[in-house]
């Protein structure tokens, strides 16, 4: 059956037929592919994880479509070496095999860091959501992103209340471009210092007391959190651009509180 199939006339390539609307497409490709990758780990050299991957290229106005299967073929080609130091090469391959001028690669993945409880010194793994966003046109561009959970305690509530203050878990999202390599662990540590207290996956009673009291002595609005992150990121000479967001999932309000700052070294 296979031999008979191969004898048939070659199949037409519909994607390469001309499109008469003359409208170019900025991004077209495949989205949400689950695939294993390797991430550099500060303490253990590397870490294996699973990423959700998006791959896009541009499409000239005269082509009807792109070749979707080639994106997955490229992933399989680099299946043993999908890592940060290979992203530019993968993007270059995408441009070559898909006849594109621009290529984009996005990855979101869980990254685990061993954390030590502040008093008991109990160790546990903490999960963080990280992103790699890379593109290649005339030059290579890369953005590292991390979502860092922290605790925030409201300064206004502390000032007004006779008994404690409302506090909640918050998510700080930071994205950076850099001129020299930055460890994920170092960026996490910097951002965790911007809330009222870090978050831990394992706390004993003595740790809970310490963390609760630390947050109470260090109240922060979302405004404080993004400003503090800005001060710390601007002090890092290898950071050329960054954006930082803070979202408090308010414990006594129906809404969330939000703040964001974006800066580049040039500005």
Curated annotation (Swiss-Prot):
Annotated NCBIfam families: PRK13674.1-1
Q: What does this protein do?
A: Converts GTP to 7,8-dihydroneopterin triphosphate.
Among InterPro entries, the record links this protein to: GTP_cyclohydrolase_FolE2, GTP_cyclohydrolase_FolE2/MptA
Pfam families, alphabetized = GCHY-1
The name this protein goes by in its record: GTP cyclohydrolase FolE2
Which is a GO BP term held by this UniProt record?
Answer: tetrahydrofolate biosynthetic process
What is its EC class? hydrolase
Q: Which family does it belong to?
A: Belongs to the GTP cyclohydrolase IV family.
Q: Which residues belong to the signal peptide in this entry?
A: none
* UniProt pathway: Cofactor biosynthesis; 7,8-dihydroneopterin triphosphate biosynthesis; 7,8-dihydroneopterin triphosphate from GTP: step 1/1
Q: Which reaction does it catalyse?
A: GTP + H2O = 7,8-dihydroneopterin 3'-triphosphate + formate + H(+)
Q: Which domain of life is it from?
A: Bacteria
Transmembrane feature ranges:
none
The record's EC number reads 3.5.4.16
Q: Which organism is it from?
A: Citrifermentans bemidjiense (strain ATCC BAA-1014 / DSM 16622 / JCM 12645 / Bem)
UniProt KW Hydrolase keyword: yes
Q: Which GO terms describe its molecular function?
A: GTP cyclohydrolase I activity
- Give UniProt keywords alphabetically: Hydrolase
- Record keywords: Zinc included? no
Name the encoding gene, please.
Answer: folE2
- Return the annotated site residues (May be catalytically important): 154
